[in-house]
Amino acid sequence: MLFWNADPILIQLGPIAVHWYGALFATGFLLGYQLMQRIYRQEGRPTEQLDKLLTYIFIGTVVGARLAHTLIYEPEYYLAHPIDILKIWEGGLASHGGGIGVLLAIWLFVRQHPENKFLWLADRLAIPTALTGCFIRLGNFMNSEIIGNSTDGSWGVVFERIDTLPRHPVQLYEAASYFAIFVLLLMLFRTTKSKQTGFLFGLFLTLVFAARFIIEYFKTPQAAYEAGNLISVGQWLSVPFVLAGIVLMLLSAKEKAR
């Protein structure tokens, strides 16, 4: 059993506080950026557009994830304290909203740069996105947020800032799942699967949101109105992503068979 009471602030520089959550988010994003540069170079693509593309994605991720969290999980609080919506370094990003924000960002980028194809980009961006998701969940762990149900298992974590109960470290479950998905996607990208348009993106959607659906059963409700529900809001929101991923993989396989 682990007793956990980490300080959410990584370092204090005078009046400026660098939070673990923000630092881990930035680390994941920067590593993803480096990976995309390598992918572009390996495929003989110019890297000049990457800065613009990833700026769009960063904005889409943060805005989409933050708005989804505030509107779905804590609408009463943020309607009463709207300025707190801007405090993203304190945590509170919903992955479903972030996913939608990323898709909109890619769509907007492709509209402005039609020489790029949506699914070609999505297949490749899926790889660093899984890695970034891993780092974001580690940030949640450092913040002692998105906690799990109580457990009698020896792997339980007591989040001392919350209570004295040993709980499932669901943040670490998700982080490990996303890292495993990242490794799998990276391995498949080095095979002929990278030539099947839409396959890697479809696999990403299916695995990430299937993992999210399963792990939700070990989480405490993130909103009061979820208490007692057999299916959580996060699970309902995951279903369309899983179905979309399966459809993309089937279409990719059908195209390959032609």
Swiss-Prot record:
Keywords: Cell inner membrane, Cell membrane, Membrane, Transferase, Transmembrane, Transmembrane helix. The chain crosses the membrane at residues 9-29, 53-73, 90-110, 117-139, 169-189, 198-218, 230-250. One of its GO terms (biological process) is lipoprotein biosynthetic process. It comes from the Bacteria. It is found in: Cell inner membrane. One of its GO terms (molecular function) is phosphatidylglycerol-prolipoprotein diacylglyceryl transferase activity. The keyword Lipoprotein does not apply. It is a multi-pass membrane protein. Pfam families: LGT. One of its GO terms (cellular component) is plasma membrane. The keyword Cell membrane applies. Its main location: membrane. It is an enzyme of class 2 (transferase). A 1,2-diacyl-sn-glycero-3-phospho-(1'-sn-glycerol) binds at R137. PANTHER family: PHOSPHATIDYLGLYCEROL--PROLIPOPROTEIN DIACYLGLYCERYL TRANSFERASE, PROLIPOPROTEIN DIACYLGLYCERYL TRANSFERASE. Catalyzes the transfer of the diacylglyceryl group from phosphatidylglycerol to the sulfhydryl group of the N-terminal cysteine of a prolipoprotein, the first step in the formation of mature lipoproteins. Belongs to the Lgt family. This is Phosphatidylglycerol--prolipoprotein diacylglyceryl transferase. It comes from Tolumonas auensis (strain DSM 9187 / NBRC 110442 / TA 4). The gene is lgt.
